[in-house]
Amino acid sequence: MNNVLFVALGGSIGAVLRYLISLLMLQVFGSGFPFGTLVVNILGSFLMGVIFALGQVSELSPEFKAFIGVGMLGALTTFSTFSNETLLLMQQGYLVKAVFNVVVNVGVCIFVVYLGQQLVFSRF
């Protein structure tokens, strides 16, 4: 039951971060492309790589993993919003933007998970 509380606490932090980052990206870049979702997915993927690698080289408590991995990063990143925004781009006739959104979200996020892992592994 304790882990549920850690997930809830981490999730509340991740959700607020996602909201604030999305607002900032909307102010900076406008609404022509879903940069907010892209940024939170890249940031969350990088941090997931770091947490995964830290778990490989050191002992992370189940509470810490629940707080960060499931709670905070689970709420920070969003596949459903990414999918909806991509579909909206397609429905509005922006096929190139939609394909770009998929390629960048998936490709960059996989790459930054790797970078996060390598950052930790190079230090241990």
From Swiss-Prot:
It is found in: Cell inner membrane. Na(+) is not transported, but it plays an essential structural role and its presence is essential for fluoride channel function. The keyword Membrane applies. It is a multi-pass membrane protein. InterPro entries: FluC. Na(+) binds at residues 74, 77. It catalyses: fluoride(in) = fluoride(out). One of its GO terms (molecular function) is fluoride channel activity. Its main location: membrane. Keywords: Cell inner membrane, Cell membrane, Ion channel, Ion transport, Membrane, Metal-binding, Sodium, Transmembrane, Transmembrane helix, Transport. GO terms for biological process: cellular detoxification of fluoride. The chain crosses the membrane at residues 4-24, 35-55, 62-82, 95-115. The keyword Cell membrane applies. One of its GO terms (cellular component) is plasma membrane. It holds the Pfam family CRCB. Belongs to the fluoride channel Fluc/FEX (TC 1.A.43) family. Fluoride-specific ion channel. Important for reducing fluoride concentration in the cell, thus reducing its toxicity. This is Fluoride-specific ion channel FluC. It comes from Shewanella pealeana (strain ATCC 700345 / ANG-SQ1).
